[in-house]
Structure formats: C-alpha cells, structure tokens
Amino acid sequence: QLNFSPNW
C-alpha cells in the first residue's frame, strides 16, 4: 500500500 500525502 502506497499512499502519498504532500506536506504543503
């Protein structure tokens, strides 16, 4: 499982 959460 790959989940992308940007830190912007």
Swiss-Prot record:
The modification Tryptophan amide is found at W8. Transmembrane segments: none annotated. The modification Pyrrolidone carboxylic acid is found at Q1. Keywords: Amidation, Hormone, Neuropeptide, Pyrrolidone carboxylic acid, Secreted. Its main location: secreted. It comes from the Eukaryota. It is found in: Secreted. GO terms for biological process: neuropeptide signaling pathway. InterPro entries: Adipokinetic_hormone_CS. The keyword DNA damage does not apply. The keyword Secreted applies. PROSITE patterns: AKH (PS00256). One of its GO terms (molecular function) is hormone activity. GO terms for cellular component: extracellular region. Hypertrehalosaemic factors are neuropeptides that elevate the level of trehalose in the hemolymph (trehalose is the major carbohydrate in the hemolymph of insects). Belongs to the AKH/HRTH/RPCH family. This is Hypertrehalosaemic factor. It comes from Tenebrio molitor (Yellow mealworm beetle).
